[in-house]
Amino acid sequence: MIFRDNQSIYLQIAERICDEILENKFPPGERIPSIREYAALVEVNANTVVRSYEWLQQQEIIFNKRGIGYYVSPEGKHHIKAIRRERFFNDELPLFFNRLYTLGISVEEIDTRYAEYLSKYLNK
């Protein structure tokens, strides 16, 4: 795994696991790799993956069955989407709106472009 400098490694690993959950690589109720397995997979120290798993547990995305392993929570996907929606609305959307304003792009033009995007990429 290639890591970026602008975010903690444990959070990048947690984001990757969230992506895998959203892609159904790890469906709700299914066991995810052990800490050691995942550490070997992404080539980091096991303590880093421990922090990732702790963060995912705090967000109620995964849970631990003591002595058995970590599992995707039944509502794990919902929690991931809620976290990402909040991050989008609080962090990304204000920057996007600022860019629209400074470039003089109208809401109508965005609406047109969004409709084109949907028809091109999602309505095949």
Label for each model-derived stretch:
Residues 31-42, 56:
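A short alpha-helical element within helix-turn-helix/winged-helix DNA-binding domains
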Residues 41, 58-61, 120:
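Residue cluster at the C-terminal edge of the helix-turn-helix DNA-binding motif
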Residues 25-26, 30, 58-67, 71-74:
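Beta-hairpin "wing" of winged helix-turn-helix
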Residues 1-31, 37, 87, 91-123:
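Extreme N-terminal segment that seeds HTH/winged-HTH DNA-binding domains in transcriptional regulators
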Residues 10, 14, 34, 70-86:
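Short, cationic-aromatic polyanion-contact patches
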